[in-house]
A protein has these predicted regions:
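Adenine nucleotide-associated cytosolic modules
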Residues: 1-197
Length: 197
């Protein structure tokens, strides 16, 4: 997004940027919030889902929907000087809830607005996610399935941790307790500031 896009819906700005970069790419924007009611319909039919969401309720909703639809999920997250990327596919390995069964308690994780984000970090993590998605689509390379890449941009360290499938996972485990989509309570709500005129 650019400064000129401030105030515009992100979906419109993103679609415009993608079309400008490659006019041969078909862009199908959906100007709607992802909800428990529409997630399965919006995500069904795609080959890979890439999650770049900035809140826990949507992150868990996307995970649960991809598990229910049998789709691979390329996860990415950033906060401060840190970022992470992983591939979750419950058909072949763990899902996001295998790593984090439930959202963190309210107030335990600062929001991006509170902690900030190093400006280049979303681009780095997004590029890593794109590489993972390409590996999944072409069936090549070694996707980060069952592995989470952790980037410490401040210290210039990249490390990897294993993520195992959890037999007790509430959505992809042996006896799942989550069998329908629900929207988790938002644990990281930041009050909106009044608009400056």
């Amino acid at each position: 997004h650019t400064s000129a896009a401030v105030g515009r819906p992100k979906v419109d700005s993103a679609a415009e940027t993608i079309r400008a970069l490659n006019p041969d790419v078909e862009v199908i924007p959906h100007r709607t919030r992802l909800t428990a009611e529409n997630a399965l319909g919006l995500l069904d039919g795609w080959d890979v889902v890439i999650d770049g969401t900035d809140n826990f309720p949507t992150r868990y909703l996307v995970n649960d929907a991809t598990v229910m639809l049998g789709l691979p999920l390329v996860h990415g997250a950033v906060l401060g000087f840190n970022g992470q990327v992983g591939v979750f596919d419950a058909r072949r390995g763990p899902c996001y809830r295998c790593l984090h069964p439930a959202p963190p308690p309210a107030g335990s994780v600062p929001s991006c607005a509170e902690a900030g984000v190093l400006g280049v970090l979303p681009g780095i993590i997004g590029t890593m996610q794109a590489a993972e998605a390409l590996k999944l689509v072409i069936g090549g390379g070694q996707p980060l399935l069952g592995r989470l890449a952790l980037l410490d941009a401040w210290g210039a360290h990249l490390r990897e941790i294993p993520v195992a499938k959890n037999p007790a996972c509430p959505v992809c485990g042996e006896n799942p307790s989550i069998t329908a989509l629900v929207t988790e309570a938002d644990t990281c709500v930041v009050p909106r500031t009044p608009e400056v005129e």
